Amino acid sequence: MPPSVKQRVDRQFRQFAHTMPLTSVRHTTKSWAVEVAVSRLTTFVISLAVVVGVFSEHPAPVRLYDILSHGSVLNRVAVVGDSYTTGTDEGGLGPEAWTARAWLTLDHQGMYIAPDVSSEGRAGYGVRGDHGSVFANLTARAVRPDDALVVFFGSRNDQGVDPALLAEMARETFDLARRTAPSARILVIGPPWPAADVPETVLRVRDVVSAAARAAGATFVDPIADRWFVGRPDLIGADGVHPNDAGHAYIADKIAPIIGAQLSWRP
């Protein structure tokens, strides 16, 4: 980079840092402060890209996450799940999904997330979903070597799978995640159920997945034992199975703190 360009970039960075240091963003809980910081940060990134682009024959792309990670930790998180994660016509589509809501909650707490969500309706560890995938296939698509955390959520869809086969496929799925992202923590959330009367087949799935998760050194969370949806029919859609938008917001409120705690334990 020619000295004149470097001087311009340095001058812009000093002006930006003087206006709104990133540390002030990380230590405030007021959403307006975050919005102002991000707005000014975006302006700086655009200005930097313009300066570099004008004076460089082959300008390198400037990514917002790269700038953010200069003064804070960017956490790459992979999520693998079923229709409770994809969302359905009952609720949880797009920005209403529990994942989108969870990232927003964590962002407001100063914890920046770069997510890769791979989910498929009707999928499970041992049963193929709407597009022919099991959780291992979804894991291969979502998990990256530099992930900080891999989250598995589900699945009630495994009710018809032989327990021995389910145990083997869950173990292989967790092993794949571990091999792909050796330094990542693994969080396994068992299948939820929208009522207090849980079928034995679902309890068996929960127990098999729990055992495989613990054997893999993962953290296991049990929505059934924690009675997430017991007495809350208002959170479930008209089909009696899938969460509505309020249900997804509720799930986000449950899972976001767990993800935050997992990321806080990073060395």
Task: Spell out what each predicted region is.
Residues 53-119, 140-142:
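Serine-esterase "nucleophile elbow" of acetyl-processing enzymes
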Residues 26-45:
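N-terminal Sec-pathway targeting helices
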